[in-house]
């Protein structure tokens, strides 16, 4: 009689994860009831660590010390003491936001017994937030993710500096807001001006120098898109679509003074391609993570490495990601962790703050929000079971 095959618990867990990822790749619906999401650039604020350090020193103090040690400088002092002009620098703001978001998750896990692996079914993050999402889902180690976010931020800052120096223009991002029923037509008018082809890829416009290009950086919600590039060129685009396209969207300059998700960030894309080697990605992760570039879950380690790199220059399909989870994957509960409420507001635009039994949208940016949020999750999970 052949010897009985012994399978370790760890091996069983890995097999289960592969099955889950295979279900995604084949279009099966594993019902991703609870999503964990993280914010992107622009939500940083001076002093955002302080309330957490005061409320949960046993968890947050070691975490902050680890953050500073990994980076090799006192980012915590910049976050707490400023000046805000120093915190707003891309190379400081991005690791600060990412680390603060992960720290809040660690507080839930260590102080409140929150079992991320059991209670969260899928993660996602808006732009920069994708790095925290990949850490939470187990694809990237926190120290590695923090280091590359810092270095990527340095490269992005240098891209912006060179573009300004070469052109004498100001670069950044601008949100266009319209009525939901007008968004498709507005996007089509923008794409026509940007010389996009029918598949949504850049054609003849790619022959322009990067500093002369404007790109569609984000599809954020049912009534908002974001443009990236020089403000001079963005205003030319707005004038064109208002005069000839019949559209008059509300235009809002974003806090960023860099043209993220545009061709001038090509060096950041090149940097990410170099550092995202096969050994840095743990595959499969603990749960699926939705890609900004495709609006669908990463389906392989190679896909993750490629699209996390491309995210620096490609459109962030945030609205597509939310629609996929809401309409196809069965997501009912949405938990946002990190500074600010921008992420929650964008999610709520699509799915509503509450509604279906067992559903809701919550976010935690301050310690006082933890207990109420945990109660809401507990109650809706109980509702879903009944």
Put a short name on every predicted segment.
Residues 47, 58, 62, 92, ...:
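Conserved active-site and cofactor/substrate-binding residues in soluble primary-metabolism enzymes
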Residues 1-33:
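N-terminal mitochondrial targeting presequence
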Residues 42-43, 137-311:
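Alpha/beta catalytic cores of group-transfer enzymes, especially the acyltransferase/condensing modules
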Residues 107-111, 240, 324, 328:
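A generic secondary-structure signal
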Residues 22-196, 333-386:
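FabD-like malonyl-/acyl-CoA
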Residues 11-22, 99-103, 311-318:
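A short, flexible low-complexity segment enriched in Lys/Arg and Gly/Pro that occurs
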Residues 247-337, 341-348, 352-371, 379-386:
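Acyltransferase
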């Amino acid at each position: 009689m052949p010897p009985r095959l012994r399978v370790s618990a760890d091996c069983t867990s890995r097999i289960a994860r592969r099955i889950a990822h295979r279900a995604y790749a084949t279009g099966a619906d594993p019902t991703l009831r609870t999503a964990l999401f993280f914010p992107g650039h622009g939500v940083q604020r001076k002093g955002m660590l302080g309330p957490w350090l005061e409320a949960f020193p046993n968890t947050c103090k070691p975490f902050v010390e680890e953050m500073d040690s990994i980076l090799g400088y006192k980012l915590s002092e910049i976050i707490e003491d400023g000046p805000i002009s120093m915190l707003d620098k891309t190379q400081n703001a991005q690791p600060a936001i990412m680390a603060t978001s992960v720290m809040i998750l660690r507080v839930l896990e260590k102080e409140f017994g929150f079992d991320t692996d059991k209670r969260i079914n899928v993660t996602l993050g808006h732009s920069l937030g994708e790095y925290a999402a990949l850490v939470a889902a187990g694809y990237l180690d926190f120290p590695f993710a923090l280091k590359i976010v810092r270095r990527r931020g340095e490269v992005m800052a240098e891209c912006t500096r060179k573009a300004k120096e070469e052109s004498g223009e100001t670069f950044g991002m601008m949100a266009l807001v319209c009525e939901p029923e007008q968004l498709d037509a507005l996007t089509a008018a923008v794409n026509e001006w940007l010389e996009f082809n029918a598949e949504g890829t850049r054609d003849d416009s790619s022959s322009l120098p990067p500093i002369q290009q404007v790109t569609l950086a984000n599809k954020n919600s049912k009534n908002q898109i974001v443009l990236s590039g020089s403000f001079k060129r963005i205003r030319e685009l707005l004038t064109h679509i208002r005069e000839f396209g019949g559209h008059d969207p509300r235009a809002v300059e974003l806090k960023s003074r860099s043209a993220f998700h545009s061709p001038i960030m090509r060096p950041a894309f090149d940097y990410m391609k170099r550092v995202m080697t096969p050994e840095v990605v743990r595959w499969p992760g603990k749960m699926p993570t939705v890609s900004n570039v495709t609006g669908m879950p990463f389906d392989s380690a190679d896909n993750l490495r490629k699209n996390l790199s491309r995210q620096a220059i490609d459109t962030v399909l945030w609205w597509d990601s939310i629609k996929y989870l809401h309409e196809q994957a069965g997501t009912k509960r949405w938990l946002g962790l990190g500074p600010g409420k921008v992420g929650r507001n964008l999610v709520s635009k699509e799915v509503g703050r509450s509604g279906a039994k067992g559903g809701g949208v919550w976010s935690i940016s301050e310690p006082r929000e933890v207990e109420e949020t945990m109660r809401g999750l507990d109650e809706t999970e109980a509702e879903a079971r009944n």
